[in-house]
Amino acid sequence: MVTREEGKEKVKGLIELFEGLYSEKSAIEKRAYNEATVREKFLNPFFDALGWIMTSNDVEVEYSQVREDDGSKGKADYRFNLGAGKEFYAEAKKPYENLAEQSKHAIQARRYAYSANHPVTILTDFEEFRVYLGRGIAPKDEDQINTAWVSSLSCRYTD
């Protein structure tokens, strides 16, 4: 189990690594980082630093979910089990997508949560974490980026 101080140091290191890439890489190199790379290099270690055991039954990576609105099957990148039937999804995107302007990503993440009747879902590219409501607000293709939006956190380390 990761202690609070160890977790803080791991998160700080991840943010410093990410910020280093952000400042040093050209636009072309930045775009070469795909969703799988973000999960492997940043998100998996980040969630581990928060105390989630990524190889346990409490976390499923690429969790298959049937969408309630059209019956299609998609894969949320993460399913976190809090116990007692409480779960949430996290959907990863490649970095530099500007999640605050891409409503299609928010709608996708919300569909996973809505279909599973989860209260919230997280959309992230590691640079930003956006929290959306899932339960009770059916996602529609024409929804705006802030529909069902709860909060955003930017990945900047402050002690």
Predicted stretch roles:
Residues M1-V120, E128-T158:
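A short, conserved, highly charged catalytic patch centered on acidic carboxylates
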